[in-house]
Amino acid sequence: MAHSPVAVQVPGMQNNIADPEELFTKLERIGKGSFGEVFKGIDNRTQQVVAIKIIDLEEAEDEIEDIQQEITVLSQCDSSYVTKYYGSYLKGSKLWIIMEYLGGGSALDLLRAGPFDEFQIATMLKEILKGLDYLHSEKKIHRDIKAANVLLSEQGDVKLADFGVAGQLTDTQIKRNTFVGTPFWMAPEVIQQSAYDSKADIWSLGITAIELAKGEPPNSDMHPMRVLFLIPKNNPPTLIGDFTKSFKEFIDACLNKDPSFRPTAKELLKHKFIVKNSKKTSYLTELIDRFKRWKAEGHSDEESDSEGSDSESSSRESNPHPEWSFTTVRKKPDPKKLQNGEEQDLVQTLSCLSMIITPAFAELKQQDENNASRNQAIEELEKSIAVAETACPGITDKMVKKLIEKFQKCSADESP
């Protein structure tokens, strides 16, 4: 549902009379998204360095719930392992979100200079686990753990970021069944839209561990939709290469397809790989220095960008500061293109799914309600179509239209 920008309410919203342009000084841009940008800034009242997300709510009106979700979760968090939220300001249609500035960049940025060694990985994973342990104790699920959403301070402190898809578990709703996250890092039970809990974050952590070791997640050379089909079907990914036994065992523990057998974040903090290899976070400043040297040597900004990173690091500019991930909001259809019919498929994305496919499956299941194996096969097919539609909106419409065209052609050919 579209919202009027003036009606937007988020935790920590400051008096609308306050002018953020007077309270804060924008410095260089450190990130860019579909509907806004992230700037390094100065709080003119305290001289504190902050990060300023500026979102155009008129452009992002269909994503306001995601924006509110991120701000709500961040405002409820009080942990040194989660990025701090300072408040929001509304000026016209622009929402200014003031957050903690972390000058070390994201783990994805730092990976552009090369994979991490096991001591660096263990140190970073330990801090991520502390963040997850905090979130899970607060009955929150991050749901999008990956290198792009792990930020570092210039001193090497590690914090979780990007809570646009984070979920809250209540006492009466212990498991969720919504389809969110990034395909390469997504747990099997999330893809299958089964009930899931905080153990989904543990799977994503295991994939992130492989990402830190290899520079990219498993299956990053494949199309995301194909990955959505393979993750539930295939055996879990394993860490291949010259790595220690304890590191491989850590990853295997995270990537158990049965979530009930995955350890909790608290249990993983006691894992041999973490206990024996993690160091003080200041050890991670070498990664930040390495990245600065790599940039200074004139490496192309596009060299390390890959389809598997969900485009977090695309659109980088040549500046000495690592860019922040800014994936809170997604691009919506262009109204002008809609008027011209150029994006008609986007408007009708779910029409065939809701009007034809879903009712057809319901009728099939009702007809065979006493045939358990047949009903199970129907449900699996229905889930697969839902997964395909989520990964590639509009694919169901195209399939149905193609089937109708084929049927009409066959009927015409058979006519006397």
From Swiss-Prot:
SUPFAM superfamilies: Protein kinase-like (PK-like). PROSITE patterns: PROTEIN_KINASE_ATP, PROTEIN_KINASE_DOM. It catalyses: L-seryl-[protein] + ATP = O-phospho-L-seryl-[protein] + ADP + H(+); L-threonyl-[protein] + ATP = O-phospho-L-threonyl-[protein] + ADP + H(+). Residues 296-343 are annotated as: Disordered. The modification Phosphoserine is found at residues 4, 300, 304, 306, 309, 325. It holds the Pfam family Pkinase. Residues 24-274 form the Protein kinase domain. Interaction with Golgi matrix protein GOLGA2 leads to autophosphorylation on Thr-178, possibly as a consequence of stabilization of dimer formation. May also be activated by C-terminal cleavage. One of its GO terms (biological process) is protein autophosphorylation. Its EC number is 2.7.11.1. SMART domains: S_TKc. InterPro entries: Kinase-like_dom_sf, PDC10_dimerisation_sf, PDCD10_N, Prot_kinase_dom, Protein_kinase_ATP_BS, STE20/SPS1-PAK, STK_MST4. It is found in: Cytoplasm; Golgi apparatus. GO terms for molecular function: ATP binding; magnesium ion binding; protein homodimerization activity; protein kinase activity; protein serine kinase activity; protein serine/threonine kinase activity. Keywords: Acetylation, Apoptosis, ATP-binding, Cytoplasm, Golgi apparatus, Kinase, Magnesium, Metal-binding, Nucleotide-binding, Phosphoprotein, Serine/threonine-protein kinase, Transferase. ATP binds at residues 30-38, 53. One of its GO terms (cellular component) is perinuclear region of cytoplasm. Serine/threonine-protein kinase that acts as a mediator of cell growth. Modulates apoptosis. In association with STK24 negatively regulates Golgi reorientation in polarized cell migration upon RHO activation. Phosphorylates ATG4B at 'Ser-383', thereby increasing autophagic flux. Part of the striatin-interacting phosphatase and kinase (STRIPAK) complexes. STRIPAK complexes have critical roles in protein (de)phosphorylation and are regulators of multiple signaling pathways including Hippo, MAPK, nuclear receptor and cytoskeleton remodeling. Belongs to the protein kinase superfamily. STE Ser/Thr protein kinase family. STE20 subfamily. Homodimer. Interacts with PDCD10. Interacts with GOLGA2. Interacts with CTTNBP2NL. Interacts with RIPOR1 (via C-terminus); this interaction occurs in a PDCD10-dependent and Rho-independent manner. Interacts with PDCD10; this interaction is required for the association of STK26 with RIPOR1. Part of the core of STRIPAK complexes composed of PP2A catalytic and scaffolding subunits, the striatins (PP2A regulatory subunits), the striatin-associated proteins MOB4, STRIP1 and STRIP2, PDCD10 and members of the STE20 kinases, such as STK24 and STK26. This is Serine/threonine-protein kinase 26.
